[in-house]
Amino acid sequence: MVKTKLSIILLSREYIRSWIDSGLVKSLLESGHFEINIYVNQDLAGLLDRHQEYKVVVLDQTDSTQSAKILNDLSWAIGRTRSLTFQFTFERIFFTDNRIYPIELGIRKSTVWLLRNLRTAIRNIKSKRRILGYSILPRCLTSRIKSNALAQVGKIPIEIKEFNPDWLIIVCNTINPTVVDYLAETRKIGIKTIVAIDNWDNLTSKSVFALTPNYLTVMGRQCVNHAISIHGIDSNSVLPFGLPRFDIYRSLKKDGVPAKNLTPKRVLYAGFSLAHSEKRVVDALADYLDIKYGPGVVEVHYRPHPAPNPRIDDYEIKNSHVDVTEYRDLSRTGMPHMNEEFINALAEANVVVGAPTTLMLEAMLVGRPCVLDITSDKFHRTSAGNAAQRYTHMRDLLAVRDLARGETIDQLISAVNKILDAGTTTVSYEIEHLYDTGGPSYAEQLTSILLA
């Protein structure tokens, strides 16, 4: 049997969790239909097991053409009004993630941060100067620049050309110049392409496609809408397969989430990647529960984001009863393993609290009662409350019916208290448009397209 040849591009370590550790590549190989080469950059060279049925190829060069960089910046500048997130990102070039003069830190520290913010803004403006320039050009000039760049763009590593795949699959969380080059060159040489978007926020927060692939795989139906409205991609080319690493939630839907002993009561706080004074929220929540139920009677577990943005609020948790998750070595993928321990952290919580993050969506997928932290603070422009209004994908989560939330710490505590008093054990949220746990696995859906 002649096998279909797949070239899979993994240029960031988090994709190892999605495509290798999830078992997706193994499933494709076990189907017997595919010959697979995995292409990585030098940074990932030592992170993959070479003793597998797939071949790992380390790319000597992954740099992009100047035309691809121009197209990528131009597309972002032209499309910056298509998403609230793009607009907020554009503002943060000038104003950074922090309040300009956070007086709550005191005059001396506030002045220091004012100067730091100014330096950061200057660096941002320098690094984004081409985008800023394109954003003020008239359409006739941007069209001419785009036309000239399209005539010259296109580059793909010789290692991929020599393999001559039937399909090139690019796993990505941002549309960057490398993706633009690969898509341009594969069009010229007749290789079919799939861009596999690796999270639910990528289409609304990163950039705009300058060139489109044959197919785009996304997390859910709402992401299909974003692909159409923001990127202008034909609906027939956008496939809501889900995420490879989220197939575990399809298995749990099919087999049922194992019953957990929810005694003692437990509240899990899921940390935010953006700068937000969440430790103040965690402390206030823990203090309230200690007063109402007794010290430590209701467990409060704080799970910080594994890669949080720097915060200027140096507040540290003071309540000694708060259990803070300490991550093991994350050097391989940059993220925690989605293993039994990870799932149990969600399933064993009576209430999951947090900003509108991926982990909150995952808690909803396993039916945990959730409370959104959409409080604001006096230090950061990206606090949960502000981000929830300025990020398109977070607004998608805000729109979910019957999802409790707190705009102030008091409101948040009240919402948590209401769930604990009611003894609510599970909630079925209407989130099929964000992620459908009832469909076939990612591997099954991908195989059907690759062999069609």
Where are these regions (language model features)?
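Short acidic-hydrophobic, aromatic-tinged amphipathic segments that line or gate anion-handling sites
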Residues: 57-60, 325-328, 333-334, 399-411
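C-terminal alpha-helical cap of glycosyltransferases
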Residues: 437-452
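Conserved catalytic-core segment of nucleotide-activated headgroup transferases in glycan assembly
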Residues: 20, 26, 246-332, 406
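Active-site and donor-binding regions of nucleotide-sugar-utilizing enzymes
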Residues: 7-33, 37-251, 309, 360
